Amino acid sequence: IGLFDQDDILHPSVLYAYVKEINEQGADYLYCDETTFKENDINKMLTMHFKPDYAPDNLRANNYICHFSVFSRKLLEGEELFRTAFDGAQDHDMILRLTDRAEKIVHVPRLMYYWRSHEGSTAASIDAKPYAIEAAKGAVADHLKKHGFKHFQITSTRACATIFRIRYQILGDPKISIVIANKDHVEDLKRCITSIQKNSTWSNYE
């Protein structure tokens, strides 16, 4: 199953690239890099989104996968595709749920999805759908609860309202290793250590 918007454009060879990964690696969830463009000219690019490979912590904080998602139908068994509770961020919710179930997630590192930017589209600005931010936080919170996390906080970062900072509850009393890059600057090192000893609220460090 592949999901894309009706007014966007796919690279002519994207299906070939995906089928190749399915045949060679047994991929059951795939995505690629993407670009936004304006008007009807894909050469008028506004942004180019070169994505990392699958990283669950990153995905919780930021729906970097977005387009062009293709996945095995078996991942939907017993699942809803889009949940109305997270309207505006239903793609983030869906991606979190399906990647949880996937056995082989493959990132095709090529610009193969062209996302049309127009008024009223989140490709142009998240301001077009301000409710999407709270919906995305709700989707991430639901995902974290399913993974057993409790007492966490999800806030938007200053960089972008849709990129979140997740503060997790610290479990136990883990030792923190403090590494100070210092060579031949004894006074600077002394000042750093004194500051740590004076101001730190955490006692278990080395």
Feature roles, as predicted:
Residues 9, 13-45:
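Conserved donor NDP-sugar-binding/catalytic core segment of glycosyltransferases
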Residues 141-198:
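N-proximal low-complexity "stem/linker" segments adjacent to membrane-targeting elements
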Residues 204-206:
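Short beta-strand/loop segment that forms part of the nucleotide-sugar
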